[in-house]
Regions:
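C-terminal substrate-binding/catalytic lobe of Rossmann-fold NAD(P)-dependent dehydrogenases
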Residues: 1-131
Length: 131
């Protein structure tokens, strides 16, 4: 999770009364697993996905130049190349037009790079098995 840019009412989350690293980690895990949990309970997560897709389509169709957390193949953002990751991206008529590097804590950059390496390794294995 990227906590360095998270805020509530303009106050950095790490300074928010009652916020702890444990609470942040618990919240992250719950958010990460909630989609699967909703599907298990047969309530589905389709509405949220539909809203997100509508936002992206709207930004493209109207050349909205919206900053959205969309996945695209990285070409240097945070030193990452040839791996698809979700980062803040300007979305307009040309699709994912520009990725934006927000300031991250060093440990967040390292975690992002580890994620990129894991994705590249997994993709390599999938492609090797497909051939």
């Amino acid at each position: 999770p990227i906590w360095s840019s998270a805020s509530v009412g303009g106050l950095p989350l790490e300074k928010y009364p009652g916020f702890t690293q444990k609470l942040g980690q618990d919240t992250f895990i719950r958010a990460k697993t909630s989609g699967a949990e909703m599907i298990k309970k047969k309530t589905g997560a389709g509405f949220a996905v539909g809203v997100s897709i509508a936002e992206v389509v709207h930004a493209i169709a109207l050349d909205g130049k919206r900053i959205l957390p969309v996945s695209s193949v990285q070409r240097g953002c945070y030193g990452l190349r040839e791996v698809a990751l979700s980062v803040p991206t300007v979305v307009g008529r040309g699709g994912a037009e520009q990725t934006l590097e927000v300031e991250l804590w060093p440990k967040e950059i390292q975690a992002l790079k580890r994620s990129g390496a894991v994705l590249q390794e997994t993709l390599g294995k999938v492609l090797a098995e497909a051939n």
